[in-house]
């Protein structure tokens, strides 16, 4: 993981005697270089005016950020929509859900020259997946709701970064991939892949279209609630700003991910920034993942105790 510190000066707030200065609040935030988190750098920068010391820590996978947050190494993290249910089912009670991040249609990306006109066309195909990833949960839940046996195709498990899935598709090692941005758009732009638009797996009742969540460490939320509220408020403000301007969103995507402007512009036209997930959706996920055998027990009855929507509510009114 990579660490980026943003140190902000603290203006006099008039809360203490003349000449006194408050100690700056500090937050450690885990994130990934993915397009739907484009507001995060600017949100951290905005906290300079509030005197907050923000350390941004980069992770490749949601799962790694989840582990760090549960261990107490992070105050806030971007994680997958399923990660609250996963944590609770495995006995970890240190995560509190705060808000969703964004949504988009999710298409199977087929290799150019292969046929994916309907879900029936996945039969016998080799499809690369990232096992346990947020998009895998979306895909698997969709198959269940459509009554499609998981063994009707050959699942090729690919670990690591999304570039590995694109490489497998480009080399012809698989017929299709189930992945996330920017690794969905890159094959399309480069010509070796296409969106199988009849195979949208973002609309399952169990998982839905949410791309991720912001969560807090439970102890950190109790100890640093004011600072975490300030971060959520800054994030929502930037989310609204970028969501209202595709050009600004595209620029922010490039700044965060290093993507070429062409790729960033395409992605900005696909993703809708803003919270989609709700506690009820997380409950449905928990039930579905238990049925899938992915988590050891159904924790849908525990979700409300580990979700705090009040910070988002306050941020949306700011």
Question: What are these language model-derived features?
Answer:
Residues 290-318:
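Conserved C-terminal helix/tail region of periplasmic/extracytoplasmic solute-binding proteins
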Residues 82, 161-252:
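Pocket-lining segment of extracytoplasmic ligand-binding domains
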Residues 49, 200-207, 272-278:
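Short, solvent-exposed loop/beta-turn-alpha elements that line the ligand-binding surface or hinge
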Residues 48, 144, 188, 255, ...:
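Short polybasic/polar patches that bind polyanions
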Residues 221-296:
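Secondary-structure end/capping motifs
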């Amino acid at each position: 993981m990579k660490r980026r510190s943003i140190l902000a000066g603290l203006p006099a707030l008039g809360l203490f005697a003349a000449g006194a200065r408050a100690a700056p609040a500090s937050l450690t935030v885990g994130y990934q270089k993915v397009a739907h988190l484009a507001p995060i750098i600017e949100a951290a920068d905005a906290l300079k005016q509030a005197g907050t010391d923000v350390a941004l820590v980069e992770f490749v996978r949601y799962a790694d950020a989840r582990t760090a947050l549960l261990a107490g190494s992070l105050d806030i993290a971007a994680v997958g929509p399923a990660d609250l249910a996963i944590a609770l089912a495995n006995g970890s009670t240190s995560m509190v859900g705060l808000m969703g991040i964004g949504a988009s249609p999710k298409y199977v990306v087929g290799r150019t020259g292969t046929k994916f006109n309907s879900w029936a066309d996945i039969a016998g195909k080799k499809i690369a997946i990232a096992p346990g990833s947020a998009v895998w949960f979306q895909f698997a839940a969709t198959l269940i709701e459509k009554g499609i046996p998981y063994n009707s195709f050959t699942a090729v498990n690919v670990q690591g970064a999304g570039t590995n899935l694109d490489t497998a598709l480009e080399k012809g090692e698989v017929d299709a991939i189930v992945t996330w941005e920017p690794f969905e758009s890159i094959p399309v732009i480069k010509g070796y892949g296409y969106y199988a638009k009849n195979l949208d797996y973002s609309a399952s009742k169990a998982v839905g279209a949410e791309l991720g969540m912001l969560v807090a460490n439970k102890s950190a939320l109790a100890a640093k609630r004011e600072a975490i509220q300030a971060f959520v408020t800054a994030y929502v403000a930037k989310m609204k700003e970028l969501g209202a301007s595709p050009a600004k969103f595209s620029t922010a995507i490039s700044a965060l991910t290093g993507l070429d402007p062409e790729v960033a512009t395409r992605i900005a036209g696909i993703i809708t920034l803003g919270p989609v997930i709700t506690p009820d959706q997380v409950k449905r996920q928990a039930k579905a993942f238990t049925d899938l055998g992915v988590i050891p027990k159904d924790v849908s009855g525990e979700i409300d105790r580990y979700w705090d929507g009040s910070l988002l509510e306050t941020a949306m009114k700011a």
